[in-house]
Every structure is written in structure tokens, then in C-alpha cells.
Amino acid sequence: MKKTTKMLGLLMAVLMMGALLTGCGSSKKANAYVVLEEDLGAEQYGIGFRKGDVALGLEVQKQLDAMIQDGKAAEISQKWFGEDIMLKDVDYLKESSAPANDDSLKKIKDKGTFILGLDDSFPPMGFRDENDTVVGFDIDLATEVCKRMGVELVVQPIDWDSKELELETGRIDCIWNGLSITDERLAAMYFAKPYIANKQIIIVPEGSEIKTVADLKGKKVGLQKGSSALDALNANPVSKELGELVELQDNVTVYSELKAGRIDAFVVDEVVGRYLISKDAK
């Protein structure tokens, strides 16, 4: 009788432990994050060059156009997005021919390197992998462009808030990292053609009371400092009614703040935001 009682006690203990472990596991389930149906406006990505470097910008565009025609750009897009998202048959935004005295392409050919400036925390366009190597969609595009141009790609991480200064002082040859084309940037840089469509989205925790842009009133909203997300938000009347605006160095950090519950909403490029959410879901 004692032996039977002891066995029953052990069985009950095992069952209780299993229930406890199951409960602990479910309590650690990660929160889900959703994108609001209403966005803060559509835009396009482009490659930014110094205003006078038209010849260089046109050569890079020539190689990109060739990659679109021969399918290489679609192959790279499929790798990162699972579909071809490259814009096709788009017009030049500025000059489609360079002045005779423009030696910007010759300088790149002579030195043999093409320095790409980027925010290295901007997945999937350009970011560091588990080996601390900068990878991404834009990096793959630029690598192929440089291969066709016969020069070496040099990836140079920069402070995104000072990107225009980095370009103007010659520390980098272009800004190629999910760079949204805005009127202000068009006035300060040379862009050939846009290559990807984008929009500014709002990410919130699933079940949040924030359902529309207007619901941001009184809320704590985070975004990347110096980004087009800030421009898009400032262009909306709700920007004057926020509880607090939090500007941080990069989007990965802003997303971490959202997951930690320290901000209520995250304004970000759709390409980046959906990638971050999809990585969390895996």
C-alpha cells in the first residue's frame, strides 16, 4: 500500500511539473506587432550623389537599367523580398546627360573604388549580419553595379543625421541605403531615377488602441533621427498633438523601444518595418 501511494505521489508531481512548465512557456509568448492601414504618405527610394556628379550618377543608373533588363536586379530582389519590387520604365528626375566638364566618373575609375555611405542598422537595405559583415539588398545591388563598372565597392557606415555633410565633404561617393527622395534632398543632391516605391507606415503592438493616424494624439511616438519618417510625420497635423516624439539613432533601436513598451508607436519606412516584423515572427 505504501509503495502504491509513493508511486501515485511521484506521478502527481510529474504532472504538476509539466503543467507548470507549459504555463511558463505560454507566458513568454512574444507580443505581435501590426501595421496600421492608414499610412503617412508614399515616396520612392533613390541613390543620392553630389550635385555636380551627374556623370557618375548616370553611369550607376546605366548599370542598374542593364541589371533590370537582364534579370539580375530581379534575382537580387527575390532573394531579399521574395518578389521583384524594382521600379521599371521610370523617368529621370533630373539631368539625363552630363556636362562636358563633369569628371566625376573618371575620378572613380582612376581611383578604382566607389564609396557607398549608409546607415548599417537599416535592414534589409544595409545592416550587419551575425558575422558583423554589412549585407543587404542595396549592398547586393551596389556590388553588382561596381563589378560591371570595373571598380571595388567600399561600404562606409555613416551617421545618418549627418549624411549630407558626409557626401558634400567627399568622404563618400554616394548615399545608397533606402534613401527616400524628398524635395529637400532633390535640391541638395543629384538623383537619376527612383528604383523602389516606399511609404511611411505606423507600427503598434497588436491590440493597441491606436487604429488611425489621429489616434497618435497624446501618444509617445518613436522614429529615426534625420529620417524621412520625421518629415512625413511633421507634414501631418497630428504631429503637433503628440504626447512625446522620441528620435533615436537607428530604426532597430526604435523598434526595441516599442517592444519594451517605452513608446506607443513607431513610424518607419514600410520596407524596413515589415522586414523587422517578419523577422520577429520567425
Region roles according to the model:
Residues 1-11:
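Bacterial N-terminal signal peptides that target proteins for export
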Residues 19-23:
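C-terminal motif of bacterial Sec signal peptides marking the signal peptidase cleavage site
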Residues 25-41, 162, 179-187, 234-236, ...:
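A ligand-binding cleft/hinge motif common to bilobed small-molecule-binding domains
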Residues 30-39, 143, 147, 152-215:
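Acidic, polar ligand-binding/catalytic clefts
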Residues 32, 39-41, 62-104, 110, ...:
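Ligand-binding clefts/hinges and TM-proximal coupling segments of bilobed small-molecule sensing domains
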Residues 43-62, 200-210:
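A bilobed periplasmic-binding-protein/Venus flytrap-type ligand-binding module shared by bacterial periplasmic
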Residues 56-59, 63, 67-75, 79-83, ...:
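Extracytoplasmic small-molecule ligand-binding "clamshell" domains
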Residues 112-118, 213-230, 241:
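Short loop->beta-strand "edge-of-pocket" segments that line small-molecule binding or catalytic clefts
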